[in-house]
Regions:
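Short hydrophobic/glycine-rich mini-motifs in sensory/regulatory modules
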Residues: 164-173
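Juxtadomain coupling helices with adjacent low-complexity linkers
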Residues: 172-222
């Protein structure tokens, strides 16, 4: 609305100046001042509207990820860790723009939740770099990254990805529902949860990682 008002004011100022026909050859000073002032105000409105649009961009539209909603968990994990993963992943998928996620520890997928696909996890160069540097890598717009094929274990139309290392052995890979959807506060929360998980994961015996990755109902039956 501000942009429309600025454009309308500028157009009216130009029309007024073009159609004004003074009785004498000289343009009255009052008219000149009014024209300059109205033109300046119209330009100011245009600038305000542009700055406002940049400071408050429209929220990107939510992408419907291609896959099936699901939850898969390694059956042999301790109950305390299962509860932590259930609570944390639920909060992640409801309180942030996350739509899909994987937890990997020691090259083994322990948890998949959200929109799932059938492709197996593969430790690619971006994930490896996050582990080596122990830094979060946020891919804000997957369409711009030539290495996006590394994440074929996520839905193919995932717009944004956060790679969060968990020590040198683990990683959280989280897919969001639109480009640039993860805020800094989202990333801080993810980092905090990763630190909490690392403490528990480093204490796991090897036997706890040997169970099948399956929906909780199937795991309970087996």
């Amino acid at each position: 609305m501000v942009l429309i008002g600025g454009l309308a004011g500028l157009v009216l100022t130009v029309i007024n100046a073009a159609t004004f026909h003074p009785v004498t050859a000289a343009v009255p000073p009052a008219f000149e001042r009014a024209s300059v002032l109205s033109g300046a105000m119209a330009v100011a409105l245009l600038l305000v509207s542009i700055l406002w649009t940049q400071a408050n961009p429209r929220d990107p539209e939510k992408v419907q990820l291609e896959g099936i909603q699901g939850l898969q968990l390694v059956a042999s994990l301790p109950n305390s860790l299962k509860q932590e993963l259930g609570w944390g992943s639920t909060l992640l998928l409801t309180a942030t723009p996350a739509s899909t996620m994987l937890l990997v520890w020691g090259q083994r997928v322990l948890l998949k939740r959200g929109v799932l696909v059938s492709e197996d996890y593969c430790n690619g160069p971006i994930v490896q770099r996050a582990k080596e540097k122990q830094q979060t890598i946020s891919l804000v717009n997957m369409a711009l990254y030539p290495g996006r094929d590394e994440f074929n274990y996520l839905p193919s139309n995932t717009p944004a990805v956060v790679v969060q290392p968990i020590g040198e052995e683990g990683v959280l890979v989280i897919g969001g529902w639109s480009p640039r959807c993860f805020s800094r506060s989202d990333e801080v929360w993810i980092e905090g949860w990763a630190r909490k998980l690392r403490t528990e994961l480093e204490l796991l015996p090897e036997v706890a990682l040997q169970g099948p990755l399956a929906p909780p109902e199937s795991a309970a039956e087996s």
